[in-house]
């Protein structure tokens, strides 16, 4: 077990891929904002890549260990110290009973991850241990960790000394500028050609009013297509309003003139258009960005997004350990290639489904 001495700014229990299949119930996946760093932390301590671990935001916690344990720290460098002695990131470390791990502020990047051999043993909620702060579920009492709490851990048989290859570590931006991939849709036809060019050729500043629900961006004004300006009144008065529809995770919805990227704890539906979506393989960049950083967006195809996801899955495995050989990597690639690509969503069918759901809900309310 581990005792929380100082909680940090917002340190929470997360697992990967989080709470899957619950959007229909109104619950987002949650999970780590930077799943690349998160999974590698678990690989280092010989856990399954998705085992529950700690996500530390901006300022890390201080923890006291009640038993011997193997740990690994990845992601943003929060200058971890064990009993006052600096310890490295991206490798597994042995911690003895009564030793204290102290973490500070991140200078490059925003989130650090602490994985414990055996994983964190909190009670799953809807199939996941991930903390969803807004609803107060998952993690420890549904909140970020607090001083005095005990973090329960599973038994483990891991050893120290495992390291991640340098070329498998995500490269953090040191100039506060991030290039983020996006896929068009589902409502790209509500924005005109001028609006699309503006979005892809502009820098977008991450506002301070951003969290795990949504990233608010500041930038130029959008322009809209005739579909948005000559729509029916049921869609709302502003061009970016639309009949309530389902949101994909990573949706960039347009609230008036403000783009908001709906991240891990974002809503499952709403009444704003979504001209672009950030694919899952690019989420780690969002997770390591701080308010004041800027994004420029690069459009890619759905097929390219799927390829990036598959490549990242290969990296987030034991193939990235320093001791791994080429044969291990080839075996892992063959395993990944057996996984069928997710079929591209038919947004025409999606729109029809959401419209039908809206009409059914309205009729039910009218009967009441």
Where are these regions (language model features)?
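Conserved "landmark" site that anchors the functional core of diverse proteins
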Residues: 1-351
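Single conserved hydrophobic/aromatic residue that forms the stacking wall/gate
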Residues: 349-368
């Amino acid at each position: 077990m581990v005792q929380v001495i100082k909680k940090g700014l917002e340190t929470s229990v997360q697992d990967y891929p989080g709470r899957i299949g619950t959007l229909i119930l109104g619950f987002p996946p949650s999970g780590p904002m930077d799943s690349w760093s998160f999974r590698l932390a678990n690989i280092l301590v010989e856990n399954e890549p998705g085992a529950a671990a700690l996500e530390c935001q901006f300022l890390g916690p201080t923890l006291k260990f009640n038993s011997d344990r193997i740990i690994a720290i990845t992601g943003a460098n929060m200058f971890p110290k064990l009993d006052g002695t600096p310890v490295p990131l991206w490798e597994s470390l042995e911690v003895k009973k009564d030793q204290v791990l102290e973490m500070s502020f991140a200078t490059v990047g925003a989130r650090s991850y602490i994985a414990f051999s055996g994983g964190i043993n909190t009670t799953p909620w809807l199939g996941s241990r991930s903390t969803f702060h807004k609803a107060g579920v998952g993690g420890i009492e549904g909140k970020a960790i607090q001083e005095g709490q005990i973090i329960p851990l599973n038994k483990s048989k891991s050893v120290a000394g495992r390291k991640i290859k340098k070329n498998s570590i995500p490269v953090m931006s040191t100039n506060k500028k991030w290039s983020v991939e996006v896929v068009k849709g589902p409502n790209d036809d509500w924005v005109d050609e001028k609006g699309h060019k503006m979005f892809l050729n502009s820098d977008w500043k991450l506002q301070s009013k951003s969290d795990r629900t949504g990233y608010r961006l500041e930038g130029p004004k959008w322009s809209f297509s005739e579909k948005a300006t000559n729509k029916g009144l049921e869609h709302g008065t502003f061009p970016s309003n639309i009949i309530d529809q389902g949101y994909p995770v990573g949706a960039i919805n347009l609230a008036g003139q403000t783009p908001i990227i709906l991240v891990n704890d974002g809503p499952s539906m709403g009444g704003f258009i979504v001209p672009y979506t950030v694919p899952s393989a690019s989420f780690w960049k969002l997770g390591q960005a701080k308010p004041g950083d800027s994004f420029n967006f690069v459009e890619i195809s759905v097929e390219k997004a799927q390829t990036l996801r598959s490549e990242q899955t290969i990296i987030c495995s034991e193939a990235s350990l320093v001791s791994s050989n080429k044969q291990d990597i080839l075996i892992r690639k063959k395993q990944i290639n057996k996984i069928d690509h997710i079929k591209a969503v038919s947004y025409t069918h999606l729109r029809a489904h959401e419209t039908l759901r809206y009409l059914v809900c309205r009729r039910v309310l009218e009967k009441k």
